A protein has these predicted regions:
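Residues that scaffold, gate, or flank divalent-cation-dependent active/transport sites
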Residues: 1-64, 68, 192
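Acidic, metal-coordinating catalytic segment for phosphate/diphosphate chemistry
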Residues: 275-383
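Generic non-transmembrane alpha-helical segments
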Residues: 47, 51-55, 85-94, 157, ...
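DNA-contacting surface of Y-family translesion DNA polymerases
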Residues: 154-302
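Long, highly charged, low-complexity intrinsically disordered interaction regions
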Residues: 79-143
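Catalytic palm subdomain of template-directed nucleic-acid polymerases
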Residues: 69-87, 162
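Short Gly/Ser/Thr- and Asp/Glu-enriched loop/turn motifs at secondary-structure junctions
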Residues: 62-66, 103-106, 246-250, 301-305, ...
């Protein structure tokens, strides 16, 4: 499970749980299970973000289902009523319920949002931390591990020194926080104290790493089949690099067996391959990915998952050159042509020799819901 409703959480179904382990609970409680439907999610996310942008010009799209809105110049507005209007509009126009948290800082807004979501009957989906009293009450309520920006490692360290709530955290000395959690942790502390230090990122920064990973429909033992997938994953990363005008100078390849098949031999390994020059070429990135696979592939293993992650990203318009090795300049022209054809004709029309020319690689989506808003043949029919 990568996403769960409140009802599913109440049944004790944890995040990341394999569906086959909970089939009995599914049957007994009429739990509906759906495969990932990224075209639908992406389209609905765009619609929600478009609606939000009509209520303020200052918006940071934080993830596919989260955004920060800045209400600068709204001093004369009743923000709680205004946000109720936003919530109602999103629900009416998209059918998607949202929760809204209002606060003077991003970190406190995340906590307010958590309260709005946790107590829908009391908050009606909107909660404002608009006083010091409410801020302190919220911080005493929230566990340290649930604070936005405090990861598992820091949460464990804080718990060891009896820092169990966000309120305990803000009472730590600034020097200790900076020393043990860096300047990032100190900024978070200031945010929880009500001092805004994290600006809105209205222009999304390019990603610092790009990954393409997949679990296979079954298990695979054949090297050539794994190679085809690694080649395809690395090329997908290269396409994403070009989409954000970036190059990479290294690629990490990994393979792993099925951890749920305890009776089978277990194996997992990965390798970082350094590319001697910055590139976003399908041919170069795929070549180094396959070289990496050769080093870590082991015969006799039932492989269930593999992936490629490109790292060392920089701008393709301004990058460091290597005095001794450089990319074939024809690759840039070829990639532009390839991207043009892909945009016009669709993905998979032109492939490298290391890819299966007949195979269209798809995720396992046996319980896929309809793509109502992006596929004409799947649109809702009214009778």
């Amino acid at each position: 499970a990568i996403s769960r409703s409140n009802e599913a959480k109440a049944l004790g179904i944890p995040m990341g749980a394999p569906a086959f382990k909970y089939e009995k609970i599914f049957r007994e409680n009429d739990v509906q299970v759906f495969s990932s439907n990224f075209p639908l999610y992406g389209d609905m996310s765009s619609r929600v973000m478009s609606i939000l942008s009509k209520f303020t010009p200052n918006i940071e799209i934080y993830s596919i289902d989260e955004a920060f809105l800045k209400f600068e110049g709204f001093e004369n507005y009743d923000l709680e009523s205004y946000c109720e209007e936003i919530k109602d509009k999103v629900l009416k126009w998209t059918g998607i319920p949202v929760s809204i948290g209002i606060a003077p800082t991003k970190a406190l807004a995340k906590i307010a949002n958590r309260i709005a979501k946790k107590f829908p009957n009391q908050t009606k989906g909107v909660y404002s931390i608009n006083s010091d009293e409410k801020r302190i009450k919220a911080l005493k309520w929230l566990n340290t591990g649930d604070v936005w920006g405090i990861g598992f490692r820091h949460a464990k360290r804080l718990k060891n020194i009896k820092v169990n709530t966000a309120y305990n955290f803000i009472n730590l000395e600034d020097g200790w926080v900076r020393k043990n959690m860096s300047v990032v942790g100190l900024r978070l502390k200031k945010e929880l104290e009500g001092k805004s230090v994290l600006d809105l990122e209205e222009v999304r920064s390019p990603k610092k790493a790009i990954a393409t990973t997949r679990s296979f429909e079954g298990t695979i033992t054949d090297y050539e089949k794994i190679k085809e997938r690694i080649s395809t994953f690395s090329i997908c990363c290269a396409e994403k690099l070009r989409a954000q005008s970036s190059n990479c100078n290294s690629i990490y390849i990994f393979v792993r067996s099925n951890k749920f098949q305890k009776n089978k031999k277990q194996y997992r390994n990965g390798i970082l391959m350094t590319i001697p020059f910055s590139t976003n070429s399908n041919m170069v990135i795929s070549k180094y990915a396959i070289e990496g696979l050769k080093k870590i592939f082991k015969k006799g293993i039932n492989y269930k998952k593999a992936g490629a992650i490109v790292m060392g990203l920089d701008s393709s318009k301004n990058y460091q050159l290597n005095m001794f090795e450089k990319e074939n300049p024809k690759h840039q022209i070829l990639m532009k042509t390839l991207d043009f054809i892909t945009k016009k004709e669709g993905t998979g029309k032109i492939k490298l020799g290391s890819q299966d020319l007949k195979r269209i690689w798809k995720m396992k989506q046996t319980k896929l819901s309809s793509r109502y808003t992006t596929e004409l043949k799947e649109i809702i029919a009214l009778k």
